Amino acid sequence: MFRSFSTAAKQAVKGTYVQRAIVGGAAVVGIGASTMLYADSLTADAMTAAEHGLHAPGYGWSHNGPLETFDHSSIRRGYQVYREVCAACHSLDRVAWRTMVGVSHTNAEVRAMAEEFEYDDEPDDQGNPKKRPGKLADYVPGPYPNEQAARAANQGALPPDLSLIVKARHGGPDYIFALLTGYPEEPPAGVVLPPGANYNPYFPGGSIAMGRVLFDDLVEYEDGTPATTSQMAKDVTTFLHWCSEPEHDERKRLGLKAMIVLSSLYLLSVWVKKFKWASIKSRKIVFNPPKK
């Protein structure tokens, strides 16, 4: 009896040592992982503004409010800037012509714009390829047939597609506007740029293949708006923001409707609760003891 008790005690003590060893090992691993993460965070914080790019200031965009929508006149002007300036190098592969109808242009205007381009059609009976005018269902064509042609025309640099550029960059429209208007006359002293590169403090590393493209009176707006550099940058940024979020206005409308409906249902539920429970919560129970 004594021997069996001693064996059980030894096993219990051994199990305790094993548990302590596991807990100690887990603690060591946790401390090591925390130390590595802390060291990595210090390394990330050591990145300079020149390496990461100057942080773009915040601008008061008219569509930033919870109930504000896009300035559709600005979208129309922004498309004009894209067509006359940006379309020479950048594409809008994910934007269909039909999405512009009722947003920035009329149905007839968009049809006319689409018909200015030719798209591949089904081959004829002899198997020869054919071309056809663009339709509303087509997507905005790019300036180059493939990536190799784009790089060859831009000294090896690949101009990014602008369909989702606002959502794909930290800072969104603020970054795009700051980049377009942030080219200085000369790079700062001590900055050495590769051949063919341009200096822009908002671009990571400061060296960018794209030079300044917006200058005062570069385009002539249809509505007579003065085409200053900042105005063109604002308009094309608004247009690109719409390209990234074409559902922006509709989403806010649905959100407002949902808030109204949910608020009404909440107030109705409060009234029903008070109506149903008022008599129950305010009732009094009187106990009359029997007379002897």
From Swiss-Prot:
In terms of superkingdom, the source organism counts as: Eukaryota
Which residues form each disulfide bond in the chain?
none
Membrane topology category: Single-pass membrane protein
What chemistry does it catalyse, as a reaction equation? a quinol + 2 Fe(III)-[cytochrome c](out) = a quinone + 2 Fe(II)-[cytochrome c](out) + 2 H(+)(out)
Q: What class of enzyme is it?
A: translocase
Q: Does the UniProt entry include the keyword Metal-binding? A: yes
Q: Which residues cross the membrane?
A: 254-272
Q: Which UniProt keywords apply?
A: Electron transport, Heme, Iron, Membrane, Metal-binding, Mitochondrion, Mitochondrion inner membrane, Respiratory chain, Transit peptide, Translocase, Transmembrane, Transmembrane helix, Transport
Q: Give the cofactor binding note.
A: Binds 1 heme c group covalently per subunit.
- Lyase as UniProt keyword: no
Which residue intervals define the domain Cytochrome c in the entry?
Answer: 73-226
Q: Which residues lie on this side of the membrane: Mitochondrial matrix?
A: 273-292
Region feature (Disordered): 117-137
Q: Hey, which stretches end up on the Mitochondrial intermembrane side?
A: 47-253
PROSITE patterns per UniProt: CYTC
What Enzyme Commission number does this protein have? 7.1.1.8
Q: How does it assemble?
A: Component of the ubiquinol-cytochrome c oxidoreductase (cytochrome b-c1 complex, complex III, CIII), a multisubunit enzyme composed of 3 respiratory subunits cytochrome b, cytochrome c1 and Rieske protein, 2 core protein subunits, and additional low-molecular weight protein subunits. The complex exists as an obligatory dimer and forms supercomplexes (SCs) in the inner mitochondrial membrane with cytochrome c oxidase (complex IV, CIV).
Q: What is the protein named?
A: Cytochrome c1, heme protein, mitochondrial
Organism, as annotated: Kluyveromyces lactis (strain ATCC 8585 / CBS 2359 / DSM 70799 / NBRC 1267 / NRRL Y-1140 / WM37)
User: Which gene is the coding source of this polypeptide chain?
Assistant: CYT1
